[in-house]
UniProtKB/Swiss-Prot annotation:
Residues 1-27 form a transit peptide. Essential component of the PAM complex, a complex required for the translocation of transit peptide-containing proteins from the inner membrane into the mitochondrial matrix in an ATP-dependent manner. Seems to control the nucleotide-dependent binding of mitochondrial HSP70 to substrate proteins. One of its GO terms (biological process) is protein import into mitochondrial matrix. Ubiquitous. Particularly abundant in heart, kidney and liver. PANTHER family: GRPE PROTEIN, GRPE PROTEIN HOMOLOG 1, MITOCHONDRIAL. InterPro entries: GrpE, GrpE_coiled_coil, GrpE_head. This is GrpE protein homolog 1, mitochondrial. Its main location: mitochondrion. GO terms for molecular function: adenyl-nucleotide exchange factor activity; ATPase activator activity; ATPase binding; identical protein binding; protein homodimerization activity; protein-folding chaperone binding; unfolded protein binding. It comes from Rattus norvegicus (Rat). Belongs to the GrpE family.
Length: 217
């Protein structure tokens, strides 16, 4: 029985070998597919964009230059803004200081009228009448003089200075000429007479002195 089975197996082997032999058509198809795949990869490789190193460097350099220009422009704007801010701060500070210094000039002008009245009052009193023989007039005169001195001290304390330019060179910024007259022995262009004293507040003319100016004969 076993010998019979062996003989049958030997007879079947050639047929089985033929059945498992690959078909030439299938082999050809597989080869074509493989070749097509390789060709496709090659085509895709050819389609990939190629980057020129020199072109990339040029682009980066242009971007660098552009960014540097933008940075420079921004810094210039920043510096100008800082300068404008500093100028504004200084102007504001100056305005505040001037307001402190000259904010009282309206009040000072009103007080000048009082000082003028006191000065005229003391000048109107005859000096020969001020004696012990007239104690009431003497006391009144001395009170006026003390008041005038005190008010001038207050003026000086607050930066208000008296301008009495007799004999000084005429200054159009501090003096106002009422007339011109020749005066013997006086230099032309100098102040010969002060009709009304002037005042300056912290170096700024608050009221010009009213004067008569010497002219050539």
């Amino acid at each position: 029985m076993a010998a019979r089975c062996v003989r049958l197996a030997r007879r079947s082997l050639p047929a089985l070998a033929l059945s498992f032999r690959p078909s030439p058509r299938l082999l050809c198809t597989a080869t074509k597919q493989k070749n097509n795949g390789q060709n496709l990869e090659e085509d895709l490789g050819h389609c990939e964009p190629k980057t020129d190193p020199s072109s990339a460097d040029k682009t980066l350099l242009e971007e660098k230059v552009k960014l540097e220009e933008q940075l420079k422009e921004t810094m210039e704007k920043y510096k100008r803004a800082l300068a404008d801010t500093e100028n504004l701060r200084q102007r504001s500070q100056k305005l505040v200081e001037e307001a402190k210094l000259y904010g009282i000039q309206g009040f000072c002008k009103d007080l000048l009228e009082v000082a003028d009245i006191l000065e005229k009052a003391t000048q109107s009193v005859p000096k020969e009448e001020v004696s012990n023989n007239n104690p009431h007039l003497k006391s009144l005169y001395e009170g006026l003089v003390m008041t005038e001195v005190q008010i001038q001290k207050v003026f000086t304390k607050h930066g208000l200075l008296r301008l009495d330019p007799i004999g000084a060179k005429f200054d159009p910024y501090e003096h106002e000429a009422l007339f011109h007259t020749p005066v013997e022995g006086k230099e032309p262009g100098t102040v010969a007479l002060v009709s009304k004293v002037g005042y300056k507040l912290h170096g700024r003319t608050l009221r010009p002195a009213l004067v008569g100016v010497v002219k050539d004969a």
